[in-house]
Amino acid sequence: MNVCRVIAAALVCGTAVAQVPTAPQLPEQDRVLARQIFKEFIETNSEDSDGSVTAVCLAARNQLLKAGFATADLILAGPNDRKQNLVVRYHGAPGSKLKPILIIGHVDVVEARKADWTTDPYTFVEKDGYFYGRGTQDMKDGDADVVESFIRLKREDYVPNRDITLALTADEEGGKSNGVSWLLKNRPELMQAEFVINPDGEGPTMHDGKVTSLLVEATEKTYADYRLTATNPGGHSSEPRPDNAIYELMHALLKLEATPFPVELNNVSRSELEAMAKITPPATAAAIEGVLKTPPDPTAIAAFSKDPEANATLRTTCVATMLQGGRAPNALPAEATANVNCRILPGHSQEETRKTLVGIFDDPKLTVEYVADDGTTSPTAPNRESLPPPPLLPAVFEPLKQVTGQLWPGMPIIPSMVIGASDSIYTMQAGLPSYGIGGAAIEDTGNRMHGRDERLGVESFYNSVEFFYLYLKALTK
């Protein structure tokens, strides 16, 4: 999941617009059921190493079966026993010619060591106004939101104007069996849609108990690792050579440090910055306005780029993340390697970026290889350009404005570009416009996803359930 963006912090300096509601419209039976589903999801270990995504999907399937969903509309599919994905079909109006809406939600979680936590990460604990447990923020809350909303809509005999598909999937956080990718490749008929909603997006950001903004993740950078290698004959350390592999590697990395990629705005990042300029303090707004100029003002770029997250909004970033060299303390290194991790702007390929790195290093003795997800390397990278950002569809944003206006009056909705990664990258590569939209409001200082004692505010969770119920109805009227 994407980390909290600089925009959220900037908005704190503006005016908070609404108290977080306590979901007064959420019926008591739905509060009880949502908590029950959430608890069951949290207490089911779905780590890659020793957990089971299948077990979480079976728990969801059982809840939906009890609610009256047909077995044929609850499809388990995946590459192995632990990595079965669940695809749920909520049928729309008979004869509707509208394409389905696809909702994707990963049910795997990052590893959690019990010794690091003050509570058991796989025991659902409520204390001091929070729910604790691995996945409470990322993203079993969103999974529970949508499952409970499906059940509530079914109980109300609601008929949407089109089919709604929910895919609960494996291995977003890691592992070799990413569920969204697997379904798109092996069961594409289940993943047809006009657009995709991914609840793995950020929910409303809060400051002092009041919401400040809702970021809608409308495009993503592409992830890529490259292995930079320097080699030479090596030798005994008592006879140093001028062409030391470690030195050559470090010279190349210093060039990388000194050579940022060019600034490049797309329709989403430009919209995000335009919104920021209207609501941030004057100094920040002035820097943003300079960045938005054609051509951008170099002084403004330098000022705005001082914040790492702001910098990542403007350009492709590549950074050294791992080093390895030498085999013994008294031997010259015959080889030295570095991993360079890149987050690539939409519209550029991994191979284009690899070639750019080769140009930056400008040393024919070095090799720059692409590192695939399984750790294997190749001399070239995939050369398919990532798709440009999708349009900001009124079919997505108008219902969103309607619902947020009910729950958080006056809260700005700001399209944003994910600088991390989510499963939306797979659906966007498949040509499906995808939008990350979360419903759980989290304090700007309260982000614990992937960390110890992960937690989510109790009322933030219940309000998120209500948000998705209202949003699904607004999307399909």
Residue spans for each PLM region:
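Sec-dependent signal peptide recognition
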Residues: 2-9
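N-terminal signal peptide c-region/cleavage motif recognized by signal peptidases
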Residues: 13-15
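Metal-dependent amide/peptide-bond hydrolase catalytic core
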Residues: 19, 201-463, 469, 475-476
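Acidic/His- and Gly-rich active-site-bordering loop/insert found
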Residues: 20-134, 153-162, 340
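Solvent-exposed, acidic/flexible segments
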Residues: 27-35, 46-57, 81, 136-139, ...
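Sec-exported extracytoplasmic/periplasmic mature domains
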Residues: 39-47, 61-70, 148-155, 188-189, ...
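Solvent-exposed loop/turn segments at secondary-structure junctions
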Residues: 47-49, 81, 94, 107-111, ...
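Acidic/histidine-rich catalytic neighborhood of metal-dependent amide-processing enzymes
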Residues: 130-131, 137-215
